[in-house]
Curated annotation (Swiss-Prot):
Taxon lineage: Eukaryota, Metazoa, Chordata, Craniata, Vertebrata
Gene field: SMAD5-AS1
Ranges for region Disordered: 1-24, 43-70
GO biological process, one term: signal transduction
Listed Pro residues bias regions: 7-19
Name this polypeptide is given: SMAD5 antisense gene protein 1
Extra remark beyond the main annotation: This protein is coded from a SMAD5 gene antisense transcript.
Tissue localization of expression: Expressed in fetal tissues.
């Protein structure tokens, strides 16, 4: 009984056009990257990132590269990749 309702939502994700999906994925990806960069930058001063991330030095350079990287994200990220991310997000939200 519980498996039936869970199987219904997943199939509803692929129907949307790939263009729309890819755009949404790119936007979400960019936002996630920005948040991650900000979190890492804020965590740097705390001193916790040392054990958390093996590269405590690159936080600053990464921030600068983040801007150009965001522009290339759409080219590097393919519709399939975005679709996978969407499916993962739906599964996580349901769980």
């Amino acid at each position: 009984m519980h498996k039936q309702p869970k199987l219904l939502p997943p199939p509803a994700t692929p129907p949307p056009p790939p263009q729309s999906s890819s755009w949404s994925g790119n936007i979400v990806f960019t936002i996630k990257i920005n948040i991650w960069l900000r979190v890492f930058s804020h965590s740097s001063p705390t001193g916790l990132p040392k054990p958390h991330s093996p590269m405590p030095s690159p936080p600053e350079p990464e921030h600068s590269v983040g801007k150009p990287a965001n522009v290339q994200i759409p080219q590097v990220s393919s519709p399939e990749f975005c679709n996978q991310k969407s499916v993962l997000a739906t599964e996580h939200a349901q769980t």
